[in-house]
Amino acid sequence: MEKISKQHVQLPNNLININPITPKDLVIYLAIRRFLNGKTGECYPSLATISKKAGAAINTVRKSIDTLEKTGYLIITKRGRQHYYSFPKDKTFEPFSFDFLDKEDLTFSEKAYLIASQQFMFKEKGEGKITYSNKELAEKINMSEKTISRINQSLVKKDYLTIEKSHKLNPITGIKINEKFYHLNQLEQAIVFTLTNHEERIQENTNDIEALKKRIAELEALAFKK
């Protein structure tokens, strides 16, 4: 049986909404953050390492690092000749598995597109569904409609995406909406959502138990006063 990796990197949900961040910057962000030391809260991968992990040119890495730093989503501390990277805390995030990030049959642009689009997917049973038109999605993820169309065609050929005509109509154009189904199992992303949802449910149960304990203590204190 194939071993499923549980390792993943977290991407802030609102990052793609910050101007002038583009999808390619998200790939670089994740390529850096995957090296984060949980104890120190820092990491120090070289530009060459980031370039290799992201599948991007050194100049692209430099530009993205500059953009991420200027927007406040990447903190750079210089110690001698070494650059240390850290990240501000964020409450909501999208998880991306190491297996997905390391997929060799996906191009840099395809990964950038999928990473930027993931937060707009309705995720269920190993599938991620998007009902936005290419034009609507282009506006949300800061990527051209033409590029999205080209990448979608490539993902369909690679069996990572299925596009189906919906019975629903676009309220403005009256044209049937195309529903896009991204195959998260094949993209090595489904297991991450399963684990993340499980952890969230555990945390919710823990919070409920703590709230119940607090309420019982309050009632006991009230009864004692009487």
Where are these regions (language model features)?
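Electropositive, intrinsically flexible nucleic-acid-contacting patches
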Residues: 1-226
